[in-house]
Amino acid sequence: MSWLSKLMPSGIRTDNTPSKKRSVPEGLWEKCSNCGSALYRPELEENLEVCPKCGHHMAIRARARLAALFDADSTTEIGARLGPTDLLKFKDQKKYSERIKIAQKNTGEYDALIAMRGLLKGRALVASSFDFAFMGGSMGSVVGERFALAAETAVEIGAPYVCFSQSGGARMQEGLFSLMQMAKTSAALGKLRETGLPYISVLTHPTTGGVSASFAMLGDINIAEPQALIGFAGPRVIEQTVREKLPEGFQRSEFLLEHGAIDQICDRREMRDRLSDLLAMLGRQPAPEVA
């Protein structure tokens, strides 16, 4: 103990007095990438990954999104055991087969699209959602097959279909097999349309490439989340190609709504009620009671 410590009254800590550090669990707080606010993770999850300070829509996992949409304990997964295979033996910096294993381990999913049937306020619904954490939500053979199975299920049970898109586009590691999914998914929607069943496409940030060029823009109603980037090529690629500066907000959902490319913009926290009301109108049914 130093001479200064002896002179200090008890209870007053000097700089060299050891202090007890409180351990804070990792991942308990998250910083908003838009406004910089420190957000309590449990509250952020309850708010569906939307910043309560500025309304910025952060990435949300596919299962969390679908859980927020469907009635509790009403869902059955479609094509759950379908998993990708490396038919082309593709290799870039890593083998495609290795990338699949890493993505499956990190996400706990077999591929980038989750499809389910269930109830929305007591009414039958089929819905699918991309998981961007799985290889950027890229569309390969399994994504296309699950989407087609979901559309077929909707036809079988006479239910509307909703898809939440969040993707960088076709999966390059599957080559032409991935590009074929653009036609496959569009054809599946054609069968759904023949029956007169509604298809609503919800575009989230980002929705680009082959996904935006196929089923993501084929909805009877196309809805986007606020400030979502939607387009085929990214703005930087376009600027480098045309050698011109793009308008501010180009390819964002607000710009697309203003120019008639989408029908509505909806906050994620209001999406369940909005979809329920729209599907009731499209199905010529009375709006369900608020639940």
From Swiss-Prot:
The keyword Lipid metabolism applies. Keywords: ATP-binding, Cytoplasm, Fatty acid biosynthesis, Fatty acid metabolism, Lipid biosynthesis, Lipid metabolism, Metal-binding, Nucleotide-binding, Transferase, Zinc, Zinc-finger. Binds 1 zinc ion per subunit. Residues 1-23 are annotated as: Disordered. Its cofactor is Zn(2+). InterPro entries: AcCoA_carboxyl_beta (IPR034733), Acetyl_CoA_COase_Trfase_b_su (IPR000438), ClpP/crotonase-like_dom_sf (IPR029045), COA_CT_N (IPR011762), Znf-ACC (IPR041010). Its EC number is 2.1.3.15. The keyword tRNA-binding does not apply. It is an enzyme of class 2 (transferase). PANTHER family: ACETYL-COENZYME A CARBOXYLASE CARBOXYL TRANSFERASE SUBUNIT BETA, CHLOROPLASTIC (PTHR42995:SF5). This is Acetyl-coenzyme A carboxylase carboxyl transferase subunit beta. It comes from Stenotrophomonas maltophilia (strain K279a). The lineage of its organism: Bacteria, Pseudomonadati, Pseudomonadota, Gammaproteobacteria, Lysobacterales.
